[in-house]
């Protein structure tokens, strides 16, 4: 998926991946991370997710990363917030109480840019990327996050041969192969998401599972 693909999707309003409501898995499983008050939380490929406002409401400081300026501006306008906008290198940084969104290439971010984030939340980043970029994404996430951190990861698992992504299928075997080396992976939830996806039903997909994981970085 090239940057132009996602830019065009946002400009055209083709954002079926966007959830208008706060994700239920986030609300149910986020407390398992046991974060300190005012923890900085990285939300990669954040779009204009309502989940960010929920995290702010939990006392977190959200650090979003998003390629599309349209998505970032929509987030703040829909919440009636006027952000302070500054330029930091190749990024435009939109900041308001409890949140900052770095608008630009996620893969160009550094840990110095985003500060000390002790947790991350990924509902729609990993599954948005094809296999080759997923490996690069995991490496970038590890470069951005500190030695002691954890996160909540939500994935989809389905027969990829029946449906062309995004969203892509990220089965447990992929996580075991490419994530488990540096992270302890605990599955905390799973449910059938097939009937909430008209695209999958139309394609004849017979099984679509949403899976929820808590990831904790292994101490070396």
UniProtKB/Swiss-Prot annotation:
Gene name of the record: tpm
A GO biological process held by the record: response to metal ion
UniProt-recorded Gene Ontology molecular function terms: thiopurine S-methyltransferase activity
GO cellular component: cytoplasm
Enzyme nomenclature, EC number: 2.1.1.67
Similarity comment text for this entry: Belongs to the class I-like SAM-binding methyltransferase superfamily. TPMT family.
The protein's enzyme class: transferase
Keywords: Cytoplasm, Methyltransferase, S-adenosyl-L-methionine, Transferase
Domain of life: Bacteria
Keyword Methyltransferase included in the entry's annotation: yes
Catalytic activity: S-adenosyl-L-methionine + a thiopurine = S-adenosyl-L-homocysteine + a thiopurine S-methylether
Residues annotated as binding S-adenosyl-L-methionine: 10, 45, 66, 123
Compartmental location: Cytoplasm
Protein name: Thiopurine S-methyltransferase
Cited PROSITE patterns: SAM_MT_TPMT (PS51585)
One Pfam family per UniProt: TPMT
């Amino acid at each position: 998926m090239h940057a132009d693909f996602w830019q065009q999707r946002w400009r055209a309003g083709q954002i079926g991946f966007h959830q208008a409501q706060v994700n239920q898995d986030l609300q149910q499983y986020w407390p398992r991370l046991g974060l300190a008050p005012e923890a900085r939380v990285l939300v990669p490929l954040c779009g204009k997710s309502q989940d960010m406002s929920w995290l702010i409401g939990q006392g977190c400081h959200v650090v979003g990363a998003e390629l599309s300026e349209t998505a970032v501006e929509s987030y703040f306008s829909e919440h009636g917030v006027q952000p302070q906008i500054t330029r930091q290198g190749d990024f435009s940084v939109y900041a308001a109480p409890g949140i900052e969104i770095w608008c630009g290439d996620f893969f160009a971010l550094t840990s110095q840019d985003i500060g000390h984030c002790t947790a991350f939340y990924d509902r729609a980043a990993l599954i948005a990327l094809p296999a080759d970029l997923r490996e690069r994404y995991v490496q970038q996430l590890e470069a951005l996050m500190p030695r002691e951190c954890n996160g909540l990861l939500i994935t989809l698992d389905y027969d990829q041969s029946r449906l062309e992504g995004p969203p892509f299928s990220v089965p447990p075997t992929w996580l075991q192969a490419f994530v488990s080396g540096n992270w302890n992976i605990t599955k905390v939830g799973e449910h059938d998401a097939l009937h909430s996806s008209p695209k999958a039903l139309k394609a004849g997909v017979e099984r679509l599972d949403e899976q929820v994981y808590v990831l904790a970085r292994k101490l070396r």
